[in-house]
Design a protein with these regions (language model features):
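Class I SAM-dependent transferase core
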Residues: 1-29
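Conserved Class I SAM-dependent methyltransferase catalytic core
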Residues: 13, 130-188
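Conserved SAM/SAH cofactor-binding pocket of Class I
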Residues: 18-96, 101-112
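Active-site-adjacent beta-strand anchor residues
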Residues: 59, 125, 151-152
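Mobile active-site "lid"/loop adjacent to the S-adenosyl-L-methionine
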Residues: 106-131
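Flexible, glycine-/basic-rich loop-and-beta segments that form/coincide
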Residues: 195-201
């Protein structure tokens, strides 16, 4: 990622980290793309997408993150082709909204005994994979055929379950980036949507 943006992170919002940059290094955005940034956080991925794509929708379950993304887009003069919404994954979108590219740097750590105010941005379920599995299932309803889905996963989570969810929902999946960290390995998975199987009556 070579772009530089004027950028602030509000307290209580996930700050861009190694996983954010790993995702941004893996994605390819075309000028004709309609992009959905799920879990937009402070909005760095939304800024990158807005500077390249035809249309961007940015969503986050956290109102604070929605505010943060909106402020950063305004600060960089990138509001004209972006909508920012508070939404729990796809629930706030029109049921027929379709995208050529969807990206998500999800909470991917398994649950532990420690509870913090940032758990919503870090914990992806008991095994760390449950939220990502739900995301992949729901994403298939919002993708055009051959649309690309990018998601960050951790070796600490149940990555086999995530890969199985991709294939069960008609995605052709591959690993496109990875980085070993101190206690885990993070990867970016890319799924290309092949369309729902036709039911023959």
């Amino acid at each position: 990622m070579n772009e530089s943006f004027e950028f602030d992170v509000l307290e209580g919002v996930y700050e861009p980290a190694a996983d954010t940059y790993l995702l941004l290094d893996a994605i390819i955005i075309n000028p004709s793309d309609s992009v959905l940034d799920v879990g937009c956080g402070a909005g760095l991925a939304s800024l990158v997408a807005a500077s390249k794509a035809k249309r961007v929708v940015s969503i986050d379950i956290s109102f604070l993150a929605v505010r943060n993304t909106t402020e950063n887009l305004r600060k960089n003069g990138l509001v004209q082709n972006v909508s920012v919404l508070q939404s729990d994954l796809f629930t706030g979108l029109a049921h027929d909204a379709k995208f050529t590219m969807i990206m998500f740097n999800p909470p991917y750590l398994p649950a532990d005994e420690m509870n913090t105010e940032m758990d919503h941005a870090l914990i992806g379920g008991e095994e760390g994979s449950e939220l990502t599995e739900r995301f992949v299932k729901e994403a298939s309803s919002h993708m055009v055929k051959n649309g690309r889905l990018y998601v960050v996963v951790s070796s600490l989570a149940n990555t086999d379950a995530i890969i199985n969810t991709f294939t069960e929902n008609y995605f052709q999946v591959e690993q496109v980036n990875e980085e070993p960290l101190f206690f885990e390995k993070i990867q970016v998975l890319k799924g290309v949507f092949k369309g729902h199987k036709e039911t023959v009556l």
